[in-house]
Amino acid sequence: PAGITTAIAAAREGMNSVILERSEHIGGLPVNGLGATDIATRGATTGLFGEFVALNREYYRQKYGDKSAQFRDCSDGYHFEPSVAAITFETMIRRTGPGKIEVLLLRQFDAQPKYVIKKGEKITSIRVLNRATGLEEYYTGKMFVDATYEGDLGAAAGVPYKLGREGAGEYGEPCAGKIYRWWKHGPDAEGTTYQGDNAVQAYNYRLCLTNNPLNRRDIPKPDNYTRAELVSLIDDV
């Protein structure tokens, strides 16, 4: 969603944008299963995120009514179905006006320096793969925003970066580094070192769950699935 809101903000300032998305739909985590925002200070909600939340709320109010369980459960728009988030983002893009934002799906950027064309330290164009046609495409712009979770464009362009987490002493942060904590309260648990390491945040699936058999969808087993490679994860769970 960072790329979407960046394009919307630019459109409101009179600029045109192209959103290049690797998958078949835009929206990031909110459109792929993360249907509940966990912001604790809702009074701080403003800007484009505030508009996103308000549109979610209005969707449930109009579709189900303000006395409905669905409207109540949407928690003023902070809780939403992924399909509703997709509708909201599409609405926000459409409201910028014709031609302001072009969305191109199935465009893959491969994180290699040769696919970034620069003039000095400034990116002038990038090469992407059209996954639908298998053809290379080049896009030129005055500014490029890497709004992905991985930051591959920045890395390929030579922007310095660091992997891992800092130790507590590096920047004077008492909650940094390797820490094991008891739930809610208590002293730091055994194994705590406060030291940094090269660990990165785990990837996982954000799935929508249901107890309604009519809403269930089977997950097909991938052709390359090998149970032995994953069975050790059971102990972690």
Name what the model sees in each region:
Residues 6, 21-22, 104-106:
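Surface-exposed patches in mature extracellular/periplasmic domains of secreted proteins
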Residues 28-40:
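Short, surface-exposed loop/turn segments at secondary-structure boundaries that line and modulate
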Residues 3:
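N-terminal Rossmann-fold NAD(P) dinucleotide-binding loop
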Residues 7, 11:
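Gly/Ala-rich phosphate-binding loop of Rossmann-like dinucleotide-binding domains
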Residues 21-24, 34, 47, 134:
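Residue-level signal for pocket-adjacent positions within structured domains
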Residues 6, 29, 155-157:
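Short glycine-/acidic-enriched loop or helix-start segments at secondary-structure transitions
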Residues 12-31:
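Glycine-rich FAD pyrophosphate-binding loop
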